[in-house]
Amino acid sequence: MFGYWGKILRVNLSDGTIKEETFNEEFAKKWLGTRGFGIYFLLKEMDPKIDPFSPENKLIFATGPLTGTSAPTGGRYMVITKSPLTGYIAMANSGGYFGAELKFAGWDAIIVEGKADHPVYIYINDENVEIRDASKVWGKLVSETERMLKEEVGDKHVQIASIGPAGENKVRFAAVMNNGHRAAGRGGVGAVMGSKNLKAIVVRGHKRVEVADKGKFMEVIREKIEKLRKDPVAGGGLPKYGTAVLVNIINEHGLYPTRNFQTGVFKYAYEQSGEAMAAKYLVRNKPCFACPIGCGRVNYLPSIGETEGPEYESTWALGANLGINDLASIIEANHFADEYGMDTISLGGTLATAMELYERGLIKQEDIGGENEPPFRFGNTEVLHYWIHKIAKREGFGDILAEGGYRLAEKFNGLEYFMGVKKQELPAYDPRGAEGHGLGYATNNRGGCHIKQYMISPEILGYPYKMDPHDISDEKVKMVILFQDLTAVIDAAGLCIFTTFGLGADDYTDMLNAALGWDFSTDDYLKIGERIWNAERLFNLKAGLDPLKEDTLPKRFLEEPMPEGPNKGHVVRLKEMLPRYYKLRGWTEDGRIPEEKLKELGLEEFM
């Protein structure tokens, strides 16, 4: 096989066994990689109803066939597990260099199962694998963990995926971190890692990924890189200003969520934009492995020195959504969130929920610990610099916040003020300004998520062509489905979603076929994406998903018209789109997958 080693590493932390398992090309052609591999093993080997923190939960680190190649952005890997935040599938994607190094070590994926009886890390040096004691780094921040483990193994070139104190303390939105500030962020994958007493995976590889036709592959790759460099977003806005280039764009279009999505316009948006960040704090760009885009940023603050980020989502989550406009405070808060290993979207969403509950009188000052605790008021930067530490350590009211926004709102009888889907906090786009994006939120397999069907591309940015953000026709619903299936392919290939700024579906077909020696059509790859999407949906259904109750949006978006800006007066007409989405997916009227659809997709073994 080209693009794969055909090897999976299985590590059982309960009994210490380490096994090599193999797969063939038929398996690869069915599941492709990353989240495809992950959902297969979750469905095959695990009861979807188990407690996410039980030793029986699998924690899977998986690469794609283009991971570790020179394909543009070919350094991605994913962490797949059952989410402690949503209770459904979690598949978190990260860049940096860890994924490529895992591939260089000769492994396509790692399946971690069981639970160690003390803190450990997994050390991988090509085919040599050990479970080692991690007591010395337990409790350490992410940067310190990486430094100490590199010293311990005596190799500064190893790549490390680790958790910080938030993961150790099972904060439900803890992340898996690599290269300091790269995050497999969403769904609480870091909390599952912490529940297994697994502090880190340390990898060193010396192999190179083989492709079917090196000459043809490089010809294709050069063509795709040139397309990306000529694109105004992938070759212009992102390398110049990072993902925070979106701040002004989204705010001008009136869907930049402000004060827990109470409105879509933030009057201080420019002060926290990518342009402002570049002018005041930027030191240099920092691209991930094989990335011609280079959206990563290294910024400098006197209080903390050099740090990476924040990205667009983090800038918003720790800024406008909390009514905070001080960019230095946002950068510092993002830095500590990364060091503790926390998803910034859920962190910000949880704090925003607390702020609205507090301002509406549902959370009292005595609930949070008395007069000495900083009050949860919108615009209060002290909240950032106090509660982030408390959440990561689960101290005081931070222990309640560590459960996430849904459980917080439920505890204080204010669920209508939780802005999330399937218990996961929503990201930085108010769906009242992009209704197809709202349908994507409601139907997303991992809950509140933008990146698995980035409808902001057609509805706001005009990729692959401009669509009216308030059109809810069948064409719009079909586009949501196409984006969901195509994103599954891009993820499974081991590439970054930002390549869709400049590349179309056929471009991914070209790269995959040249690398793998396959003769698949774009429709063949989209069928793999559809299979992955439906398999993840099936896992959720088996885990207890009630579609008609949970494929929905907060009441604010369905019943409260946007109060100001370009989208003033608009709500999301989800009830008009959802039945057509189910029908076009080939599902039942109540959102379930019929037997004939499962058979069509080759999923009958999981029926």
UniProtKB/Swiss-Prot annotation:
Keyword Iron among UniProt keywords: yes
Protein name according to UniProt: Tungsten-containing aldehyde ferredoxin oxidoreductase
Family: Belongs to the AOR/FOR family.
Residues reported in the UniProt entry to bind tungstopterin: 76, 93, 95, 182-183, 185-186, 338, 343, 446, 452, 491, 495, 497
Reactions the enzyme catalyzes: an aldehyde + 2 oxidized [2Fe-2S]-[ferredoxin] + H2O = a carboxylate + 2 reduced [2Fe-2S]-[ferredoxin] + 3 H(+)
Keywords, sorted A to Z: 4Fe-4S, Iron, Iron-sulfur, Metal-binding, Oxidoreductase, Tungsten
Organism per entry: Pyrococcus horikoshii (strain ATCC 700860 / DSM 12428 / JCM 9974 / NBRC 100139 / OT-3)
UniProt subunit comment: Homodimer.
Annotated InterPro entries: Ald_Fedxn_OxRdtase_dom2, Ald_Fedxn_OxRdtase_dom3, Ald_Fedxn_OxRdtase_N, Ald_Fedxn_OxRdtase_N_sf, OxRdtase_Ald_Fedxn_C, Tungsten_al_ferr_oxy-like_C, W-dependent_AOR
Molecular-function GO terms, alphabetical: 4 iron, 4 sulfur cluster binding; aldehyde ferredoxin oxidoreductase activity; electron transfer activity; metal ion binding
Annotated binding of [4Fe-4S] cluster, by residue: 288, 291, 295, 496
EC number: 1.2.7.5
Binding note for cofactor: Binds 1 [4Fe-4S] cluster per subunit.
A Pfam family matched in the record: AFOR_C
Cofactor(s) this protein cannot do without: [4Fe-4S] cluster; tungstopterin
